[in-house]
Amino acid sequence: EFPDRRLLGEDVIWSGSPEEGMLSSHRILTTATHLGDGVYGKASGKKLRYRVIADCHAINNQINDEWLIRDQGAVVRQLGWDPKEYAIDLIEREGGPGKCIKPFHPSIDKTGPYTGRGNDNDWGKKYSEILNRIMSADLNVIPVEYDRAVTGFYPGGSELYSSDGVDGFWTKLRASFPSATFSIDHQIGREDPLMPPRAAIRWSLTGKHDGWGAFGKPTGAEVHVMGASHVEFGPWGIRREYTLYDETSIWKQIAMKTG
């Protein structure tokens, strides 16, 4: 569908060693033109820009485990779809709720080669603590730990500014799944020459869609949100935050229950 797709590597936040194995989190900005028919419908000729974060485990010069999150919300919006409507249409194209391809859920997970969690660098620990506090509704942490002029890059290709923007994003997500279990699955921190201190976290929310928030009226659907976040730290706290999850996957899980 995207024969001219270009992958522009923005950052790689990594841990480990070639001998023992390496966990790396790659943030990629993709540009493409919708030139072929496929899962996104008939070729439209529209130009797209979206991000991907992929956590990869490699050893012996080979990647043997990967967790990839594409900003599908950004893709479908640029093609003229609403993410919810796209998910509903996709279910029908795949044969209905009983036959469609099921989004990933921990209940169907298979243990892969990598069972570690990253490294114990202080910057990764700090960001993990911040996210855990946010997900515990301790929103006072945001104006304390985020730069007043922070820029946040979020699902759907959205950009939000200031600690107020960060607060709004995380609050709306958590409000949709207030009883869901929050988990830190990968945690990496790094300091490199000519770069700000950075952290990469792969996280998840697993539970019921039982609150009003970013995903509308609560439905009670069982939902798994796989998310990934990168941050850069400055002298006044987090100055850039990049967070991705697949909105269409979440809407698909909701629509499979509601019909």
Predicted regions and their residues:
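C-terminal and inter-domain tail/linker signature
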Residues: 1-259
